[in-house]
């Protein structure tokens, strides 16, 4: 910031330094020079002022909201306490009916989607995910076949071992 380029045209560029006027106190002059070197530019100043104004507005709105909530609670607390034996059971029944209705609708949609998928799968239309079901079925069949072969192989082995242990059997 202390250096500025001067010159016009293709000639040599010279740099001039901005010198501060000497003050009477050496330490005070040094402090002022440091402060002047760190002065924010206009963009930073406008950003800071915007932040300050926005923060003040939000703080004011927060105070108004908290105050109105407290005043509303103070004014309506007796009314809420006096009428609670009437509206608490009504709200509970309404909540349970709404939850039951929405659960029934959700289960109905899930059953309809599952039934549609199963119908498409069994009719051979190959719905989304049928390849995975076919793969799982083939894996289960392969595993059952291996278990069956293993049982045949080692089942005969165990029967011969039993005959060795009890020759008359």
Swiss-Prot record:
Motif segment (Proline-knot): 78-89
GO cellular component terms, semicolon-separated: membrane; monolayer-surrounded lipid storage body
One GO term of the biological process aspect: anther development
Modification sites for N-acetylalanine: 2
Tissue-specificity statement: Expressed in pollen (at protein level).
UniProt KW keywords: Acetylation, Lipid droplet, Membrane, Transmembrane, Transmembrane helix
InterPro entries to which the protein is assigned, alphabetical: Oleosin
Pfam families assigned to the protein according to its UniProt record, in alphabetical order: Oleosin
Record field: transmembrane: 45-65, 75-95, 99-119
Tree of life domain: Eukaryota
Keyword Chaperone on entry: no
Region (Disordered): 1-25
Membrane topology listed for this record: Multi-pass membrane protein
Subcellular location, record wording: Lipid droplet; Membrane
Domain notes: The proline-knot motif may be involved in the targeting to oil bodies.
Family: Belongs to the oleosin family.
PANTHER family per the UniProt record, alphabetical: F27J15.22, OLEOSIN
The name this protein goes by in its record: Oleosin
């Amino acid at each position: 910031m202390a250096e500025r380029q001067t010159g016009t045209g293709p000639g040599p560029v010279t740099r001039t330094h901005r010198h501060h006027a000497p003050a009477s106190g050496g330490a005070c002059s040094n402090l002022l020079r440091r402060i002047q070197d760190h002065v924010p530019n206009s963009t930073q100043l406008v950003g800071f002022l915007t932040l300050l104004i926005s923060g003040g507005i939000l703080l004011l709105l927060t105070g108004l909201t908290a105050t109105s909530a407290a005043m509303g609670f103070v004014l309506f607390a007796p009314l809420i306490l006096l009428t609670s034996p009437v509206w608490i059971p009504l709200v509970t029944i309404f909540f349970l009916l709404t939850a039951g209705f929405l659960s029934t609708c959700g289960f109905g949609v899930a059953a309809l989607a599952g039934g549609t998928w199963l119908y498409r799968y069994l009719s051979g239309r190959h719905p989304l995910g049928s390849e995975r079901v076919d793969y799982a079925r083939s894996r289960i069949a392969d595993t059952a076949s291996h278990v069956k072969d293993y049982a045949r192989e080692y089942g005969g082995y165990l029967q011969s071992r039993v005959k060795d242990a009890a020759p008359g059997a």
